[in-house]
């Protein structure tokens, strides 16, 4: 029994020794096999990377190039191509649209799209770019960019744009484009002092009004009419002389259109006529005759009126009408054509021949023009302020403070 155990132990020990001696050789062979396998797998991976590249790498590279496609002056990777034979990528700076279109499907291996439109490369230029075009990669990216561009253009169309045109030497007209492309809004006219004086400027505007309206598609006049002071200190006086608006258009002055025929007495009561100055007070006929004899006679003016009167005529019309109270009954025998500037006399009846007009200097820099009719009715024709002493705002304040006194003293 003991002998058998000893034999088995001896045999086991010998076997263990043999296995121990054989283990280093087998370990070496296993290590070398594993190393060979690792080398084989690593070599095949490098070859596969050179030939095709992994999908995840292609995806990340594609997104990075998509983000940088809008900045061609910095980095432009959208034009490089691969020969597919394991060589390095070629960096192309001079890429044409046709070459990019042929290289894009083979480079990116994009899946076919369901839409019916073919791939159309689009050249994208950045204002800060160096002039090298970059080609858009995907169709839906181009669609998104086009939608963004169309939205920006629509936003620009909704904003009124101010622009200036030089009609002829010495004449500049400022327009404001009406949103929607409906036309232009006439805002300001500037005349050169070296080529035009006040009278020539107004005469030019009266002669060329229709041509300017037709040529520049003028639909409306600027709503900024009235008494806004120009911002330029150099052209301040010229701005005030040549600032024409709907209130003071020369086209509506008596010098530019014929007066209408006198109304009939039967239809005079129901006749609607433009804004006219109303009589604020009446004097006795005898006293008015003596006053009229002391005044110098008025002579009709045939020259073009002062353009500066355009700004104030309508304003004084409204103030005079408000201060005069209820209007006097309309007398058909004294019907005249009324315009907003009324720089010349319009006569519709022989009774108006007896009217006289004179100028009173209320204070230095303030001249008041008064008209008196044969029946003693007076009206305030014009109040003129010197540009050396009064600005527009100061003139308005002065008139508000002295309006009642002027009416009581002169009318």
Swiss-Prot record:
Major site of localization recorded for this protein: nucleus
A matching Pfam family: BRX
Segments for region (Disordered): 10-31, 103-149, 245-294, 324-346
Polar residues composition-biased segments: 20-31
UniProt biased composition (Acidic residues): 136-149
Keywords of this entry: Nucleus, Repeat
InterPro entries in the record: Brevis_radix_dom, BRX-like
Bias type Low complexity, positions: 276-294
Subcellular location: Nucleus
Keyword tRNA processing on entry: no
Entry's family note: Belongs to the BRX family.
Protein name: Protein Brevis radix-like 2
Species the sequence originates in: Oryza sativa subsp. japonica
Gene: BRXL2
